[in-house]
Regions:
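A short, well-ordered alpha-helix in the C-terminal region of glycosyltransferases
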Residues: 366-381
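Conserved acidic donor-binding segment of nucleotide-sugar-dependent glycosyltransferases
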Residues: 345-352, 360-365
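Conserved catalytic-core segment of nucleotide-activated headgroup transferases in glycan assembly
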Residues: 173, 191, 197-299
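Acceptor-binding helix/loop patch of EC 2.4 sugar-transfer enzymes
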Residues: 9, 68-89, 130-169, 187, ...
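Acidic donor-binding loop of glycosyltransferase active sites
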Residues: 176, 283, 295-312, 323-326
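Short hydrophobic beta-strand element within catalytic cores of glycosyltransferases
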Residues: 316-319, 326-330
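N-terminal subdomain of nucleotide-sugar transferases
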Residues: 1-63, 104-106
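Donor nucleotide-sugar binding/catalytic pocket of nucleotide-sugar-dependent glycosyltransferases
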Residues: 63, 131-132, 139, 157-191, ...
């Protein structure tokens, strides 16, 4: 088997949130034809129990504990040396020593980096083909954060956006290939760095459509007689927190005023204090961790994705579409998804439009045409098999000179 070094900023298992879904499917696919040497961080104590599962797919492995609080403090060193804070956040000398050992002792033919913060570990490598999966343009996400933050965080976020964009460009120039999660994201990066356009491509996230299938039987987790709106996601993630807080405060009251029996369920692990506080609002339920999100999707009346901060492709939207649910999404949540608006995916432009569309769909009953079309779109365009074939082609190319 050909040997490959794979560096990931977060352990690629379990595949229960956006980045881990993509990094896991990459690992699983790569392991079919490569001996994969994996270096990664673990930033959730609950994930240590999965290391044997991950090891079963790998050759050599290195798992490094990352305490988010301590890493944030350590990242401030970037302020003193003019670096994006992302780099010291993900810097670890033990991981660097392991990378050096693997590259010095194993016949590694390809290096795959998942997310920009991990590229620093192979910045001096020249004799091995290097590919980076940026996934999203993270620098733009930091700029989005800055628009809703007060001082001094808005200054820090703008600084991070500017410096990280410079680093993203540096990586794209130096590496042999770069990938993103959608054609939209790749095209935006083409505009930011035209000279590297020939090296930049994309492969879509996929959905396991057999797992997320409306044909399966699921227990109903909701009380009888209620109309349910549901949002799913990791509820300590800033973009998700912003989305549900905005929806709960700016959209949901208008819906409840018209339809008092409607309830809004926020489903996902580790709800932040701001999210947990929403449970005090009439008609809002915060579940915390659930072992299986599919029953919550299957029995919901509508799925909402009101993200105001977003890049790339939202897996939560694709999963709901695969379950034949009507998804009402913000423009940011819908960006990058190849779906016909109003026929496969419904887009709401602002809080008034969101409330109007939710009320209209709930009052007018079933729309099986939209539901079926949504799943067909996922089946046609969002399978892992189709997307990951592009990575195979990149790995088989000769190293750029």
């Amino acid at each position: 088997m050909r040997e490959l070094l794979y560096l990931v900023h977060r352990i690629p298992y379990p595949p229960n949130k956006g980045d881990k879904i993509r990094s896991y499917h990459l690992l699983e696919h790569l392991a079919q034809h490569h001996r994969v040497h994996l270096g990664t961080f673990i930033d959730d104590e609950g994930d240590w129990k999965y290391i044997e599962k991950v090891r079963s797919l790998c050759g050599e492995t290195c798992f490094i504990n990352l305490h988010p609080g301590m890493a944030r403090v350590g990242s401030l060193s970037g302020l003193l040396c003019g670096k994006p804070l992302t780099l010291p956040y993900y810097w670890n000398s033990r991981l660097q020593a392991w990378v050096n050992h693997v590259l010095g002792t194993r016949p590694v033919e390809n290096i795959l980096i998942f997310s920009s913060g991990m590229a620093q570990y192979v910045s001096r490598v020249r004799h091995i083909r290097r590919i980076i999966d940026f996934v999203d343009i993270d620098s733009d996400k930091w700029m989005q954060y800055s628009t809703s933050a007060g001082w001094p965080m808005n200054w820090i976020y703008r600084r991070e956006s500017r410096l990280l964009l410079g680093y993203e460009k540096e990586i794209a120039r130096a590496f042999d290939s770069a990938t993103f999660v959608s054609e939209t994201e790749a095209n935006l990066f083409h505009q930011l760095l035209p000279e590297a356009a020939a090296k930049v491509t994309h492969f879509n996230n996929g959905v396991d459509a057999n797992y997320f299938s409306p044909q399966n039987s699921y227990p109903n987790p909701y009380p009888e007689g209620k109309r349910i709106l549901v949002f799913t996601g990791a509820m300590d993630y800033r973009a998700n927190v912003d989305a549900v807080v905005w929806f709960a405060r700016s959209v949901f009251p208008a819906i409840r005023a018209k339809l008092p029996k409607v309830e809004f369920y926020i489903v996902g692990a580790r709800p932040s204090d701001a999210v947990a506080a929403l449970a005090a609002f009439p008609g809002i339920r915060v579940t915390g961790f659930v072992s299986d999100v599919r029953p919550y999707l299957a029995h919901a009346s509508l799925v909402v994705a009101p993200l105001r901060i977003a890049r790339g492709i939202q897996n939560k939207v694709l999963e709901a579409m695969a379950m034949e649910k009507i998804v009402i999404a913000s423009p940011s949540a819908a960006e990058g998804i190849r779906a016909r608006r109003e026929e496969e995916l419904v887009v709401a432009l602002d809080e008034q439009d969101f409330a109007h569309r939710v009320i209209s769909f709930l009052q007018n009953g079933a729309h099986p045409g939209i539901c079926r079309a949504a799943r067909v779109r996922v089946l046609e365009d969002y399978s892992w098999k189709n997307g990951l074939g592009r990575i195979d082609r990149l790995l088989s190319q000769p190293q750029a000179v």
